Amino acid sequence: MGGERTNPLEGRVAVVTGASRGMGRAIALRLARDGADCVVMYRRDSVRAGEVVAEIERLGRRALPLQIELGEPAQVEPAFARVSEAFGRVDVFVANAAATAFKPMIEQKPHNIQRTFAISIESFVAGVQAVVPLMKGRPGRVVAVSGVDSHQVVAAHGVLGAAKAALESLVRSLAVELGPLGITVNAVSPGLFLTDSAQFYVERGINRAYTEAVAQVIAITPVRRVGTGEDVAALVAYLVSDAASFLTGQAIILDGGLTSVSQLDRLQAGG
């Protein structure tokens, strides 16, 4: 429509964790295309992070690569101090990073559980605590990337599903606390998406052939495809836009309708 802004995030600064690949990469690039300068937080792959930064800069936006180990929440505050030095503000915080050991619950080790919750819960809270002062009274946006494992049992996802369920509870609490400050807080809960981590989960977590598993999921998904990083990025782009100023405290399932399919229908489809 003629009244829409070409670059709805022009002049804003976005921080995206886990942004060197997969969904995080797609989110960072979409926000940059919408006009935002971006902080590309990553754990260890500096080459891929550098490629994302280069793509953002080719779009005419500023970008800052920032290495951080979110399994150590104490690193979060210093990281946001660097963001403040570089940009002086933050308007959008997307907590995308996650990690877990894809194992049955009875095989989980304490350090795996602790690391999963350190990244999904402790570092998320530390990030919000650090970012709120940088929003400086302007309308702010916080988006957490959750998953359908917070709503239903997914094989070998017990620990991550528990962490994501806790994450969505925090989203609701933060939405109530931060709403009066003009900050919205929402979650996106993707299903199976075409990402490196999804392939790793299928092949190593449940010992299935990736292409076969994807084909079976497509067969029982109402829209007859699986998601891409760009699908998540499009939803995040809406949630951080001015158009979503009245939407907060929600966890939106993004799975092409798969969780709405009954078990009977799945059996009939051979899923």
Regions flagged by a language model, labelled:
Residues 2-5, 237, 248-271:
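Short C-terminal tail/terminal secondary-structure segment
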Residues 13, 20-21:
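Conserved glycine-rich cofactor-binding loop
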Residues 36-51:
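Conserved glycine-rich Rossmann-like NAD(P)H-binding loop of the short-chain dehydrogenase/reductase
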Residues 99, 106-125, 143, 160, ...:
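Catalytic Tyr-X3-Lys loop
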Residues 139, 179, 184, 247-249:
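Short, small/polar-rich loop/turn modules that mediate ligand/substrate recognition or access, typified
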